[in-house]
Amino acid sequence: MFTLKKTLLLLYFLGTISISLCKQERDADEDDGRKMTEEEVKRSIITMTKEAKLPQSWKQIACRLYNTC
C-alpha cells in the first residue's frame, strides 16, 4: 500500500511540474506573439503565392501533366 501511495504521489508531482512548465512556455509564446497587421497579412499572402509558382495558363498545366515541356 505504501509503494502505491509513493507512486501516485510521484506521478502527481511530475504531472504538476509538467503542467506548470507548459503554462510557462505558453505564456512566453503569448508575450512574443503579437497580432499581425493587415499589411503583414497581405505581404505573407503575396509571398506564399509567389513561392507556389502556380502555372500561368492551361498550356503549362497540360505540359506538366503530360511531360511535354
UniProtKB/Swiss-Prot annotation:
Biological-process GO terms, alphabetical: defense response to bacterium; killing of cells of another organism
UniProt-annotated location(s): Secreted
Chief localisation class: secreted
GO CC field: extracellular region
Disulfide bonds: 63-69
Statement: the UniProt record of this protein carries the keyword Disulfide bond: yes
Residues annotated as signal peptide: 1-22
Protein keywords: Amphibian defense peptide, Antibiotic, Antimicrobial, Cleavage on pair of basic residues, Cytolysis, Disulfide bond, Hemolysis, Secreted, Signal
Keyword Cytoplasm carried by entry: no
Residue ranges of the propeptide: 23-43
Tissue note: Expressed by the skin glands.
Protein origin, superkingdom: Eukaryota
Function recorded in the entry: Antimicrobial peptide. Has activity against the Gram-positive bacterium S.aureus ATCC2592 (MIC=15 ug/ml), the Gram-negative bacteria E.coli ATCC25922 (MIC=60 ug/ml), B.dysenteriae (MIC=60 ug/ml), H.pylori NTCT11637 (MIC=30 ug/ml), and the fungus C.albicans ATCC2002 (MIC=30 ug/ml). Has little hemolytic activity on rabbit red blood cells.
Family per similarity comment: Belongs to the frog skin active peptide (FSAP) family. Pleurain subfamily.
Protein name, UniProt field: Pleurain-A2
